[in-house]
A protein has these predicted regions:
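Active/ligand-binding-proximal structured segments within catalytic/core domains
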Residues: 1-3
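Conserved catalytic neighborhood of penicillin-recognizing serine enzymes
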Residues: 7-66, 110, 114, 124-145
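Surface-exposed patches in mature extracellular/periplasmic domains of secreted proteins
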Residues: 14, 78-89, 115-119, 150-155
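Structural recognition of the beta-strand scaffold that forms the well-ordered cores
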Residues: 16, 44, 56-58, 68-69, ...
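Mid-domain, small-residue-enriched loop/turn segments at the edges of structured enzyme/sensor domains
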Residues: 28-33, 62-103
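A penicillin-recognizing enzyme superfamily signal
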Residues: 44, 97-206
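Glycine- and acidic
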Residues: 51-52, 85-89, 193-197
Length: 206
């Protein structure tokens, strides 16, 4: 989403977004921490996974267009029966697989080109441009500068772009790390989708 907003010229890395109670029609998202931070930069909003700024950006980009961009890159969104992409999409309103998520995040290390994961080395490589090379560079720099989610200020020799997530109801905790050579995704959850209270992407999957 942030890369698409960068490509559209809607924001740059230090543009200010408002993290405060807002209504988007009849939708009023809150943050995971149940608090708000006021004006925040795009970089901070992305690093901290702030919900309200993300919904604001999705409203400007358009949820249907955003979903189409993801599907074109191999992320086959699973929506509730009869539902069309809406603003809840960016907060877990649609599902995907870990493999598809990793393929999309690989674009950050591949100049904006997503690659469908292959299970066999001789399988054909399927690539799709998801974002511009410039947007991929900026988003990767933002996620690298945030550090590892559970220890954001620890020094490390490896530059890793980290992103984590926790689904509504604690059904899924996930993390993706991107380097020049590897893109690794981790999912923690139960096959039947029952909750794991206290399981967060940053402290469980990362």
């Amino acid at each position: 989403l942030y890369a698409l907003a960068l490509d559209d010229g809607l924001v740059h890395s230090e543009s200010l977004l408002v993290d405060a109670p807002q209504n988007f029609g009849d939708y009023a998202p809150g943050n995971f921490q149940a608090s708000f931070n006021g004006p925040v930069s795009v970089s901070e909003a992305l690093q901290r996974s702030l919900n309200v700024p993300a919904v604001d950006l999705l409203e400007r980009v358009g949820p249907v267009r955003f979903a189409a961009q993801l599907r074109n890159a191999g992320v086959k969104l699973r929506m509730p029966q009869g539902a069309t992409p809406n603003l809840s999409l960016i907060l877990g309103g649609g599902g995907t697989t870990l493999e598809e998520l990793v393929g999309a995040y690989a674009a950050l290390a591949r100049g904006g080109v997503a690659a469908h994961p292959r299970l066999m080395p001789d399988a054909p490589l399927v690539e799709t441009r998801l974002m511009s090379a410039g947007a991929a560079f900026i988003v990767r720099e933002i996620l690298e500068s945030g550090g590892r989610p559970d220890t954001p200020f620890r020094e490390t020799s490896a530059r890793v772009a980290w992103k984590t997530g926790t689904s509504f109801g604690f059904r899924d905790a996930w993390a993706v790390g991107v380097t020049d050579r590897y893109t690794v995704g981790i999912w923690v959850g139960r096959p039947d989708g029952t909750p794991n209270p206290g399981f967060f992407g940053a402290n469980t999957a990362a």
